[in-house]
Amino acid sequence: DRSEEIRRIVTGKDLKPPQPEQELMRAIVETVFDIFYLVTVLTVGIRMIRGSGDNTQFRLFGLMAVVLGAGDSFHLVPRALALCTTGLEHYAVPLGLGKWITSVTMTVFYVLLYYVWRKRYQIEDRKDLTAAVYALAAVRIVLCMMPQNQWLTNHTPLAWGILRNVPFALLGLLIIVLFYRSAKENNDRAFRWMWLTIVLSFGFYIPVVLWADVNPLIGMLMIPKTCAYVWTVLIGYNAMKAENGKNN
Protein backbone atom coordinates (compact mmCIF):
# COMPACT_ATOMS: atom_id res chain seq x y z
CA ASP A 1 0.00 0.00 0.00
CA ARG A 2 0.93 3.67 -0.07
CA SER A 3 2.33 3.72 3.49
CA GLU A 4 4.59 0.76 2.74
CA GLU A 5 5.86 2.49 -0.39
CA ILE A 6 6.68 5.64 1.60
CA ARG A 7 8.47 3.55 4.24
CA ARG A 8 10.63 1.89 1.59
CA ILE A 9 11.53 5.25 0.08
CA VAL A 10 12.49 6.75 3.46
CA THR A 11 14.57 3.75 4.51
CA GLY A 12 16.14 3.42 1.10
CA LYS A 13 15.25 -0.26 0.76
CA ASP A 14 14.32 0.20 -2.90
CA LEU A 15 17.69 1.73 -3.69
CA LYS A 16 20.35 -0.29 -5.46
CA PRO A 17 23.77 -0.49 -3.77
CA PRO A 18 25.99 2.34 -5.03
CA GLN A 19 28.41 1.39 -7.79
CA PRO A 20 32.17 2.04 -7.40
CA GLU A 21 31.96 4.91 -9.89
CA GLN A 22 29.15 6.52 -7.88
CA GLU A 23 31.07 6.13 -4.63
CA LEU A 24 34.17 7.69 -6.20
CA MET A 25 32.16 10.63 -7.54
CA ARG A 26 30.52 11.13 -4.14
CA ALA A 27 33.94 11.08 -2.45
CA ILE A 28 35.32 13.66 -4.87
CA VAL A 29 32.30 15.99 -4.65
CA GLU A 30 32.09 15.84 -0.84
CA THR A 31 35.83 16.28 -0.35
CA VAL A 32 36.09 19.28 -2.70
CA PHE A 33 33.03 20.86 -1.12
CA ASP A 34 34.31 20.32 2.43
CA ILE A 35 37.71 21.82 1.60
CA PHE A 36 36.00 24.85 0.03
CA TYR A 37 33.76 25.24 3.09
CA LEU A 38 36.55 24.97 5.68
CA VAL A 39 38.88 27.32 3.80
CA THR A 40 36.06 29.84 3.31
CA VAL A 41 34.79 30.06 6.88
CA LEU A 42 38.27 29.99 8.45
CA THR A 43 39.60 32.64 6.05
CA VAL A 44 36.58 34.88 6.55
CA GLY A 45 36.74 34.39 10.32
CA ILE A 46 40.42 35.32 10.53
CA ARG A 47 39.89 38.35 8.28
CA MET A 48 37.02 39.52 10.47
CA ILE A 49 39.10 39.19 13.64
CA ARG A 50 41.98 41.12 12.06
CA GLY A 51 39.75 43.74 10.44
CA SER A 52 37.33 44.31 13.30
CA GLY A 53 39.45 46.93 15.05
CA ASP A 54 37.66 48.09 18.18
CA ASN A 55 34.32 46.65 17.05
CA THR A 56 33.55 43.87 19.52
CA GLN A 57 30.55 42.71 17.50
CA PHE A 58 32.61 41.80 14.44
CA ARG A 59 35.47 40.38 16.48
CA LEU A 60 32.95 38.04 18.10
CA PHE A 61 31.56 37.19 14.67
CA GLY A 62 35.04 36.36 13.40
CA LEU A 63 35.72 34.18 16.44
CA MET A 64 32.37 32.50 15.84
CA ALA A 65 33.38 31.65 12.24
CA VAL A 66 36.74 30.26 13.37
CA VAL A 67 35.05 28.11 16.03
CA LEU A 68 32.64 26.86 13.35
CA GLY A 69 35.38 25.93 10.88
CA ALA A 70 37.83 24.54 13.42
CA GLY A 71 35.15 22.42 15.09
CA ASP A 72 33.80 21.06 11.81
CA SER A 73 37.30 20.16 10.64
CA PHE A 74 37.51 17.49 13.36
CA HIS A 75 34.66 15.69 11.62
CA LEU A 76 35.08 16.66 7.96
CA VAL A 77 38.80 15.86 7.63
CA PRO A 78 38.48 12.22 8.81
CA ARG A 79 35.30 11.93 6.73
CA ALA A 80 37.18 13.01 3.60
CA LEU A 81 39.98 10.55 4.40
CA ALA A 82 37.45 7.76 4.92
CA LEU A 83 35.59 8.46 1.67
CA CYS A 84 38.84 8.57 -0.31
CA THR A 85 40.34 5.40 1.22
CA THR A 86 38.68 2.38 2.86
CA GLY A 87 35.22 3.78 3.62
CA LEU A 88 33.31 5.32 6.52
CA GLU A 89 32.81 2.04 8.39
CA HIS A 90 36.58 1.74 8.96
CA TYR A 91 36.86 5.21 10.53
CA ALA A 92 34.31 4.84 13.32
CA VAL A 93 36.56 6.21 16.09
CA PRO A 94 37.95 9.36 14.37
CA LEU A 95 34.55 10.12 12.82
CA GLY A 96 32.76 9.64 16.12
CA LEU A 97 35.30 11.74 17.98
CA GLY A 98 34.93 14.44 15.33
CA LYS A 99 31.13 14.45 15.67
CA TRP A 100 31.52 14.65 19.45
CA ILE A 101 33.80 17.68 19.23
CA THR A 102 31.61 19.32 16.58
CA SER A 103 28.51 18.90 18.76
CA VAL A 104 30.22 20.99 21.44
CA THR A 105 31.72 23.64 19.13
CA MET A 106 28.36 24.15 17.39
CA THR A 107 26.84 24.86 20.79
CA VAL A 108 29.57 27.43 21.47
CA PHE A 109 28.86 28.89 18.00
CA TYR A 110 25.28 29.72 18.98
CA VAL A 111 26.31 31.17 22.34
CA LEU A 112 28.71 33.50 20.50
CA LEU A 113 25.96 34.36 18.02
CA TYR A 114 23.75 35.34 20.96
CA TYR A 115 26.43 37.81 22.08
CA VAL A 116 26.70 39.15 18.53
CA TRP A 117 22.97 39.89 18.80
CA ARG A 118 23.48 41.68 22.14
CA LYS A 119 26.33 43.80 20.77
CA ARG A 120 24.69 44.64 17.45
CA TYR A 121 21.40 45.78 18.99
CA GLN A 122 23.00 47.22 22.15
CA ILE A 123 21.12 45.00 24.57
CA GLU A 124 22.14 45.94 28.11
CA ASP A 125 19.84 43.88 30.31
CA ARG A 126 17.75 40.76 29.58
CA LYS A 127 19.55 38.55 32.10
CA ASP A 128 16.69 36.08 31.70
CA LEU A 129 17.68 35.50 28.08
CA THR A 130 21.33 35.06 28.98
CA ALA A 131 20.40 32.53 31.65
CA ALA A 132 18.24 30.63 29.16
CA VAL A 133 21.04 30.54 26.57
CA TYR A 134 23.57 29.24 29.09
CA ALA A 135 21.12 26.71 30.53
CA LEU A 136 20.25 25.26 27.11
CA ALA A 137 23.92 25.20 26.08
CA ALA A 138 24.93 23.49 29.34
CA VAL A 139 22.21 20.84 29.04
CA ARG A 140 23.19 20.20 25.43
CA ILE A 141 26.90 19.77 26.29
CA VAL A 142 26.17 17.53 29.29
CA LEU A 143 23.95 15.31 27.12
CA CYS A 144 26.70 15.15 24.48
CA MET A 145 29.14 13.91 27.14
CA MET A 146 26.98 10.98 28.18
CA PRO A 147 28.51 7.56 27.31
CA GLN A 148 25.10 6.40 26.08
CA ASN A 149 25.74 8.40 22.89
CA GLN A 150 28.26 5.72 21.83
CA TRP A 151 30.10 8.28 19.74
CA LEU A 152 33.01 5.97 18.89
CA THR A 153 30.89 3.29 17.21
CA ASN A 154 29.29 2.98 13.79
CA HIS A 155 25.78 2.92 15.22
CA THR A 156 24.87 5.69 17.66
CA PRO A 157 21.43 5.32 19.32
CA LEU A 158 18.72 7.36 17.59
CA ALA A 159 17.02 8.13 20.92
CA TRP A 160 20.15 9.86 22.21
CA GLY A 161 20.61 11.65 18.91
CA ILE A 162 17.16 13.15 19.35
CA LEU A 163 17.59 13.83 23.07
CA ARG A 164 20.85 15.78 22.79
CA ASN A 165 19.43 17.84 19.93
CA VAL A 166 16.30 18.98 21.81
CA PRO A 167 18.10 21.72 23.83
CA PHE A 168 20.19 22.52 20.74
CA ALA A 169 17.05 23.08 18.65
CA LEU A 170 15.51 25.21 21.42
CA LEU A 171 18.69 27.30 21.55
CA GLY A 172 18.54 27.73 17.77
CA LEU A 173 14.85 28.68 17.94
CA LEU A 174 15.62 31.33 20.55
CA ILE A 175 18.36 32.84 18.37
CA ILE A 176 16.04 32.77 15.34
CA VAL A 177 13.34 34.72 17.18
CA LEU A 178 15.82 37.26 18.58
CA PHE A 179 17.39 38.09 15.20
CA TYR A 180 14.05 38.12 13.38
CA ARG A 181 12.48 40.58 15.83
CA SER A 182 15.51 42.82 16.24
CA ALA A 183 16.33 43.07 12.52
CA LYS A 184 12.69 43.96 11.79
CA GLU A 185 12.37 46.49 14.62
CA ASN A 186 15.65 48.21 13.71
CA ASN A 187 15.17 47.98 9.93
CA ASP A 188 18.54 46.20 9.82
CA ARG A 189 18.93 45.32 6.16
CA ALA A 190 22.40 43.83 6.61
CA PHE A 191 21.11 41.21 9.07
CA ARG A 192 17.56 40.87 7.75
CA TRP A 193 18.13 37.26 6.61
CA MET A 194 20.19 36.07 9.57
CA TRP A 195 17.17 34.31 11.08
CA LEU A 196 16.52 32.49 7.79
CA THR A 197 20.05 31.07 7.61
CA ILE A 198 19.51 29.45 11.00
CA VAL A 199 16.06 28.14 10.01
CA LEU A 200 17.56 26.54 6.90
CA SER A 201 20.49 25.02 8.79
CA PHE A 202 18.14 23.31 11.25
CA GLY A 203 15.67 22.40 8.49
CA PHE A 204 18.37 20.43 6.67
CA TYR A 205 19.97 19.07 9.86
CA ILE A 206 16.91 17.52 11.55
CA PRO A 207 16.18 14.95 8.78
CA VAL A 208 19.83 13.85 8.95
CA VAL A 209 19.55 13.21 12.69
CA LEU A 210 16.33 11.24 12.26
CA TRP A 211 16.90 9.21 9.10
CA ALA A 212 20.53 9.27 7.91
CA ASP A 213 21.28 5.89 9.51
CA VAL A 214 18.46 4.17 7.61
CA ASN A 215 19.00 6.02 4.33
CA PRO A 216 22.56 7.32 3.83
CA LEU A 217 21.44 9.53 0.93
CA ILE A 218 19.66 11.77 3.44
CA GLY A 219 23.12 12.60 4.75
CA MET A 220 23.60 14.67 1.58
CA LEU A 221 21.37 17.30 3.22
CA MET A 222 24.46 18.27 5.21
CA ILE A 223 25.69 20.06 2.07
CA PRO A 224 22.85 22.64 1.92
CA LYS A 225 23.02 22.85 5.73
CA THR A 226 26.67 23.79 5.42
CA CYS A 227 25.82 26.36 2.72
CA ALA A 228 23.39 27.96 5.18
CA TYR A 229 26.23 28.38 7.70
CA VAL A 230 28.45 29.91 5.02
CA TRP A 231 25.63 32.38 4.36
CA THR A 232 25.52 33.18 8.09
CA VAL A 233 29.24 33.95 8.13
CA LEU A 234 29.10 36.01 4.93
CA ILE A 235 26.27 38.15 6.34
CA GLY A 236 28.58 39.21 9.16
CA TYR A 237 31.57 39.71 6.86
CA ASN A 238 29.63 41.84 4.37
CA ALA A 239 28.16 43.91 7.21
CA MET A 240 31.67 44.57 8.55
CA LYS A 241 32.95 45.63 5.12
CA ALA A 242 29.97 47.95 4.65
CA GLU A 243 30.41 49.58 8.06
CA ASN A 244 34.18 49.90 7.66
CA GLY A 245 33.58 51.55 4.28
CA LYS A 246 31.28 54.13 5.86
CA ASN A 247 33.87 54.94 8.52
CA ASN A 248 36.72 55.46 6.04
Each model region followed by its residue ranges:
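Hydrophobic transmembrane alpha-helical segments in integral membrane proteins
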Residues: E23-V41
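Membrane-interface helix-boundary motifs at transmembrane edges
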Residues: R50-R59, R118-L129, R181-F191, G245
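Hydrophobic alpha-helical membrane segments
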Residues: G71, L170-L174, R192-V208
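Juxtamembrane "helix-exit" motif on the non-cytosolic side of transmembrane helices
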Residues: L81-C84, C144-N154, I206-V214
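Non-cytosolic membrane-interface motifs at loop->transmembrane helix junctions
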Residues: L88-K99, T153-N165, P216-P224
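Membrane-proximal helix-loop-helix units in multi-pass membrane proteins
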Residues: V104-L174
